[in-house]
Amino acid sequence: MGDCRPLGFLIGLPFALVALVLALVGAVIWIIGTVLSCLCPCCFCFAALANFAVDLIKLPIKVLRWFTHSIPC
């Protein structure tokens, strides 16, 4: 039953690499958003930007999990 899980990992790998690039972009956005929210705490949009960046950082793991669980066994 567990032999198809590596197949899902291999199929999802190119998408995970794209998600990894987005995660790096998210890390940069998170750093910029955190600095800007410290400079101007009255702007709530910077906090929302930082939360969006954290979601981008978690994206590669979510993509791999989705592909691994999508392969029927």
UniProtKB/Swiss-Prot annotation:
Protein name (record): Signaling peptide TAXIMIN 2
Function, in words: Signaling peptide involved in the regulation of lateral organs separation.
Tissue-by-tissue expression: Confined to the vasculature of various organs, including seedling roots, leaves, cotyledons, sepals and petals. Also accumulates in root hair cells.
Alphabetical UniProt keywords: Developmental protein, Secreted, Signal
Disruption phenotype annotation: No visible phenotype.
Organism whose genome encodes this protein: Arabidopsis thaliana (Mouse-ear cress)
GO CC annotation terms, alphabetical: extracellular space
Domain of life the protein comes from: Eukaryota
InterPro entries cross-referenced by the UniProt entry: TAXIMIN_1/2
Signal sequence residues: 1-27
Localisation per UniProt entry: Secreted
